[in-house]
Design a protein with these regions (language model features):
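N-terminal cap/lid segment of alpha/beta-hydrolase-fold proteins
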Residues: 49-99
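Short beta-strand element of the alpha/beta-hydrolase
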Residues: 90-93, 101-110, 130
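Primarily recognizes the serine-hydrolase "nucleophile elbow" in alpha/beta-hydrolase
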Residues: 200-265
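Short beta-strand/loop motif that positions the catalytic acidic residue
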Residues: 287, 293-295
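Catalytic histidine neighborhood in serine/cysteine hydrolases
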Residues: 314-330
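Surface beta-strand/loop "capping" patches
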Residues: 345-388, 400-414, 465-473, 508
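Extracellular ligand-binding interfaces
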Residues: 475, 486-570, 576, 583-610
Length: 611
């Protein structure tokens, strides 16, 4: 009896604590799962009971800026209540200063970014209302301390993303910790789930604003924001979406050829649960609105093949892809302008006459493949380029420009097929705009649409075969075709993936030779080499080389592998170089020379790998 009497108080305390926890959870947006049997095992079940309109937003207007054209408000609103604490998001809400309802969209920034007032002002001048959500909580205004506060949950992948991050290390899995919703493995413990909840609440915010036409709402985002776009695209309130450099599915699938580090599967103890509830591949089949993927041909996050694998899951044909070639994570003006056109067409119902995805064919006969493309609206067509590669690593492959033949309205390319190597091919079609368009940071009179990417992938891929292909590229670069094999971020420096071209002799007994004519100027040459995103064992890191050059005639600069500096004391290996970036600075003005134009090629004339 004494033992029973001693037990009763403990039972009472446990009961009181249990009731307290239930009351606490009852106020939460989501009641935590306690048993594995409660955990949803597919995306429909995961979201079926969530109503993004149910809880009041409790909007606060922190500050307003007003001009004759645009009104911008710094606002915060409630995402939800998690672990008994409110999570609130800061954002810029911008709209045209006209008394009418406007088409609108949510913009979700990337993992290294923040919301931008200027972006909202630009799009307001284009006739859109926008909500630019600051989901990472980085500072926005020097005189405003109020910002995003996630309370007791942490939706970030690591402390470097968010100043108020509660975790001290990376987290990508579905396991529970002190800052997740559920105490057991659950898709709601993924950072993406919380970010998608915030995105849906952002749509609710737009719905409730008198300046917004709630029937004309879209969603767009960059990088991590592109993934948020993909997860939010299944919301029936969304009329069109534009994921930038993010949003692809199949991130858990390694590239062919056992390329180490090409997937995120190693992060998951519950890989099947991630596949069925969080990976974008289970969202795209449920998306019914028009989709525009904007990316780069060598994007590390939105990898090239995964874009097309994701779009193949759509149950409608209303999609486009636009990428800039030889670039990573950096769409150019010819891609950015399509955001304006896409939302004009599908949110404002303005007919922009965007061409269909250029029709293409791909046929294999023995050791040869034939690719054809027949772009539509050829009266507006400026250029058609065909690119191919045998390298399964889409992050670092060099896209080779194919020789094409034109017959009437069709371009064709004959490509060799090699045993135990994949082959990838697509066309890039450049179109003229009706008039030049001023973008937020640039302007353009053309835009680009990709064809479908075609490929053959053997069951067994042997990357060693790449090294045995004929070495037909005798000159690294002579600029006879301009910077066709290069890209640029600043319209000054140029970057290429050409060290990954299998038709180039990259033997380590070679030296890098540059022919440069300073034209009487005092110049500083800088070359940056990187191995990032190659298969993990081949990632040597970063290398740099600088040299001063002057004179009035052409001279040859010969650089040995040992001349490049590396923080870890490593030596360059030519086959293990992913990117090569070249910058030349005028030391008198400290301005970079423009290496994208003919004038720059009068100075930087030729690049070779020599004995």
């Amino acid at each position: 009896m004494k033992e029973l009497n001693r037990t009763v108080p403990f039972l009472r305390i446990a009961l009181i604590w249990h009731v307290f926890v239930l009351q606490l959870c009852a106020a939460d947006t989501f009641i935590p799962f306690q048993e594995a049997s409660e955990v949803p095992d597919d995306v429909v079940e995961l979201w079926q009971d969530y109503d993004a309109r149910r809880e009041p937003l409790e909007v606060q207007i922190i500050k307003e800026w007003k001009t004759d054209d645009v009104i911008t408000r710094y606002v915060t609103f409630k995402v939800g209540t998690f672990k008994g604490s409110d999570a609130r998001l800061a954002a810029y809400f911008s709209f045209p200063n006209h008394p009418q309802k406007h088409a609108a969209f949510v913009w979700s920034h990337g993992g290294g970014q923040r919301a931008q007032k200027e972006r909202g002002i630009y799009f307001a001048k284009q006739g859109f209302a926008t909500l630019d959500i600051n989901w990472l909580g980085r500072p926005l205004e020097a005189d405003i301390q109020v910002n995003t506060d996630w309370g007791k949950v942490d939706p970030t992948q690591g402390p470097q993303f968010y100043s108020k991050a509660l975790r001290k290390s990376w987290k990508r899995n579905l396991q529970p910790d002190d800052y997740s919703i559920d105490p057991i493995a659950s898709p709601r413990n993924a950072n993406w789930f919380l970010l998608a909840v915030a995105a849906r609440r952002a749509i609710t915010f737009l719905e409730e604003q008198p300046e917004v036409d709630r029937e004309r709402i879209g969603f767009a985002g960059y990088s991590m924001g592109g993934m948020i776009t993909a997860l939010t695209a299944i919301d029936s309130r969304v009329r069109a979406v534009v994921p930038f450099v993010g949003g692809t599915g199949f991130k858990y699938v390694d590239f062919p050829g056992r390329i180490e580090g090409s997937s995120i599967r190693q992060h998951f103890r519950n890989l099947e649960l991630y596949q069925s509830t969080i990976d974008a591949s289970v969202y795209w089949p449920l998306v019914t609105c028009p989709v525009l993927f904007i990316s780069s041909s060598n994007d590390f996050h939105s990898t090239f093949e995964r874009i097309y694998q994701s779009l193949a899951l759509l149950r409608h044909p209303n999609w486009r892809v636009s990428t800039n070639v030889h670039q990573n994570h950096g769409p150019g003006p010819e891609q950015w302008v399509l955001l304006n056109l896409w939302f004009n067409q599908y949110l404002k119902d303005i007919e922009e006459d965007i061409p269909e995805t250029p029709p293409s064919t791909f046929k294999i006969s023995g050791n040869s493949a034939t690719f054809t493309v027949t772009p539509g609206q050829q009266e507006r067509l400026v250029d058609t380029e065909v690119y191919y590669s045998y390298d399964p690593n889409s992050r670092t492959r060099f896209w080779i420009s194919a020789d094409t033949k034109r017959s009437a309205s069709t371009w064709s390319a004959e490509l060799p097929v090699h045993e135990r190597l994949p082959l990838y091919v697509f066309a890039l079609c450049r179109y003229q705009l009706r008039k030049s368009v001023q973008l937020q940071h640039d302007h353009t009179s053309t835009f680009v649409l990709n064809s479908l990417e075609h490929s053959i992938i053997p069951k067994s891929v042997d990357l060693n075969v790449l090294a045995t292909l004929p070495k037909t590229r005798t000159v690294f670069e002579d600029f006879d075709d301009g910077i066709q094999d290069w890209s640029t971020r600043d319209n000054r420096s140029i970057k290429t993936y050409k060290f990954q071209s299998p038709d180039l002799d990259r033997s380590n007994d070679k030296k890098l030779s540059l022919t440069i004519n300073p034209l009487g100027k005092k110049l500083r040459l800088r070359i940056n080499l990187e191995s990032q995103f190659l298969s993990r064992p081949n990632n040597l890191g970063k290398f740099s080389y600088t040299r001063e050059i002057n004179g009035n005639k052409a001279q040859t600069v010969v650089i040995d592998r040992d001349d490049f500096k590396n923080a870890d004391g490593k030596t360059v290996e030519w086959p293990k170089i992913a990117t090569c970036e070249i910058t030349i600075v005028d030391q008198e003005t400290q301005a970079k020379l423009d290496l994208t134009q003919t004038a720059g090629h009068e100075i930087l004339r030729k690049i070779e790998l020599i004995d």
